[in-house]
Amino acid sequence: VQRGSKVRILRPESYWFQDVGTVASIDQSGIKYSVIVRFDKVNYSGINTNNFAEDELLEVAPPAAK
């Protein structure tokens, strides 16, 4: 998983469970939920990003080539 990857969410309690989002950034500092994922649709409170742990994500497409 790297910046720009398309990922499927595997966290059952998430609003975006089984949905696909784009990795916005990855924090290397050692925190548990280090991957920020951006989505096309917003959740109930109008937010379109969330932090996930790497083991809660399944990469479905690599980042687009520049």
From Swiss-Prot:
Domain of life of the organism encoding this protein: Bacteria
Protein location: Cellular thylakoid membrane
Pfam families to which the protein is assigned, alphabetical: PSI_PsaE
Gene Ontology CC terms: photosystem I reaction center; plasma membrane-derived thylakoid membrane
GO biological process: photosynthesis
Role summary: Stabilizes the interaction between PsaC and the PSI core, assists the docking of the ferredoxin to PSI and interacts with ferredoxin-NADP oxidoreductase.
Similarity field: Belongs to the PsaE family.
Name listed for the protein in its UniProt record: Photosystem I reaction center subunit IV
